[in-house]
Amino acid sequence: MLTLEASQLDGPHPSYMFSDSSFYDLDSCKPLPTFPHCLMEAEPPTDPCAGWLELAEPGYEPFDSGQLAPLHTVTVPYGHGPYPPAPSDAIYSLEGPLPAPSHCPVLPEEYGAQPYTLYSPCPLPSTPLSEDDDFPTDAPALEVSDSDSDENLSPGGSLDLDSGSRRKLRLYQFLLGLLQRGDMQECVWWVEHDSGVFQFSSKHKEALAHRWGQQKGNRKAMTYQKMARALRNYGKTGEIRKVKKKLTYQFGHKLLGLSGPRAPS
């Protein structure tokens, strides 16, 4: 017990007796000083797992690679989604170039297992004839590839002018008629009438060929080159033969004897 002396107190006060525990109670009633939180020392965390990063890494023992189990490819089932699954052959190597995506849809029926038929080589066009159309006399006769090949002769190869009116007009008949009537003299004329030699004009020969095409009713335009081939084909049967002169031909003797050509007036 503590006794307060009267001399320490101002004025007449009675003396009081306090126990030791009373002072401890008074200390608990003192206000504690307040400090900003930024100046206060941070208390260490009380979480026992907070320092797990500071633990030393345990040592690992060496392992044998043969103990590893081989990996197997696992096929993941494709679920319903907006995009179809990528095929297995669409995985490309990083070393090679990536193929460009195709933006054009390809119909499956455009490709088949049967290969396409190869086209036969196109024949090269023959060398065009010169303007004079000079054929060597010893050259073989040319085959007619146009509609002049339908000019058939009577049986035995003889000429039958009587039945010619009932048949299709032939080229030699067309030319012989022009020379006898004197038509288109600027295109064709007699050189030696008695021998049956006639000549075409180098300037108007195409006009004569065009007239012959219209006479036959051909859809394609007739050219002098085609008409000259038909004239060469007559060399097989003897109606017309080529003379060693440019654009000059001669009727056969049989044709001249049967038709009886007369000199132009």
UniProtKB/Swiss-Prot annotation:
Q: In terms of domain of life, where is this protein from?
A: Eukaryota
Q: Which residues bind DNA?
A: 169-252
Location in or out of the cell: Nucleus
Task: Provide any one GO MF term from the record.
Answer: sequence-specific DNA binding
Q: Where is this region: TAD2?
A: 42-63
Is Lyase set as a keyword in this record?
no
Q: What does this protein do?
A: May act as a sequence specific transcriptional activator.
Q: Which PANTHER family match?
A: ETS (PTHR11849), TRANSCRIPTION FACTOR SPI-B (PTHR11849:SF174)
Sequence similarity = Belongs to the ETS family.
Q: This protein is called what? A: Transcription factor Spi-B-like
The organism encoding this protein is Paleosuchus palpebrosus
